[in-house]
């Protein structure tokens, strides 16, 4: 099966394979088969619309983890200019699972921070599969405090299965690093806009997700635990992951209904990986609009609204 397609997209993959076969036949035999190709393309588009119009929570979770889905560095490339990455937590080391630095959004200087996974095996290992250690969160905290000093808005991109649970991370006080970030972000006197671009996994996501505006891409997820983890606890088997995903309410649409998410950013048909540039433009427009809405607030009003927003969780 084509690695660009997930299991539930198999009918679409089959049609695309037929289209590619016809293109090869046309190249080899100089036959005019454009009408048949056009018909199959229309059929593929309609089938894609049908499948993606009825996705389950578990299928959305699979899309959120798609290996070709745009990551933080992809959005940095498409949306921002003059990005200058900053490294290290000034306590232990640098953590490549979190990237951050100063950049410009249009002409506005901002601080950008986000989880970063990896494409190939070497990069996945270097980025620890997007699971930060304590030094990653301490680096993020250092950059956020720097942003406050220089009066820069903070934009965070969330995409992690969770904070790294290894022994070395626990030895360096993973829980304290996350808790400290929550405390600091709640008090920062500068606008914070967070966007879930893939997986929003538990405290590992929340550690850069305390904000004034929270966005989720249409096929992203946000939850206290993975569906597999929840199923393993409740039913003693990860095979019930689909049931767990449905019960947990992990999707952007459901979290918007609950009042946790401020805006759901639409994705191209088939998911963000089908057209990263279009997805990035949608994110850019959303960020610009939200920063504009926050620009006129003084520090006290900003903190008061942030506090009220956090306290409203669970009231919907």
UniProtKB/Swiss-Prot annotation:
EC class, as a word, reads: transferase
- Annotated SUPFAM superfamilies: ClpP/crotonase (SSF52096)
**Pfam families associated with the record:** ACCA (PF03255)
Taxonomy, superkingdom: Bacteria
Q: Where does this polypeptide localize?
A: Cytoplasm
Q: Which reaction does it catalyse?
A: N(6)-carboxybiotinyl-L-lysyl-[protein] + acetyl-CoA = N(6)-biotinyl-L-lysyl-[protein] + malonyl-CoA
> InterPro entries, alphabetically?
Acetyl_CoA_COase_a_su, ClpP/crotonase-like_dom_sf, COA_CT_C
Listed GO molecular functions? Answer: acetyl-CoA carboxylase activity; ATP binding; carboxyl- or carbamoyltransferase activity
Q: Which keywords accompany this UniProt record?
A: ATP-binding, Cytoplasm, Fatty acid biosynthesis, Fatty acid metabolism, Lipid biosynthesis, Lipid metabolism, Nucleotide-binding, Transferase
CC per GO annotation: acetyl-CoA carboxylase complex
Give the GO biological process terms.
fatty acid biosynthetic process; malonyl-CoA biosynthetic process
- Per UniProt, residues of the CoA carboxyltransferase C-terminal domain are 39-293
Q: In which pathway does it act?
A: Lipid metabolism; malonyl-CoA biosynthesis; malonyl-CoA from acetyl-CoA: step 1/1
EC number from the UniProt entry: 2.1.3.15
Instruction: Describe the subunit structure.
Output: Acetyl-CoA carboxylase is a heterohexamer composed of biotin carboxyl carrier protein (AccB), biotin carboxylase (AccC) and two subunits each of ACCase subunit alpha (AccA) and ACCase subunit beta (AccD).
Described by its record, this protein's role is as follows: Component of the acetyl coenzyme A carboxylase (ACC) complex. First, biotin carboxylase catalyzes the carboxylation of biotin on its carrier protein (BCCP) and then the CO(2) group is transferred by the carboxyltransferase to acetyl-CoA to form malonyl-CoA.
Q: Quote the protein name from its UniProt record.
A: Acetyl-coenzyme A carboxylase carboxyl transferase subunit alpha
Q: Which organism is it from?
A: Azotobacter vinelandii (strain DJ / ATCC BAA-1303)
**Which gene codes for it?**
accA
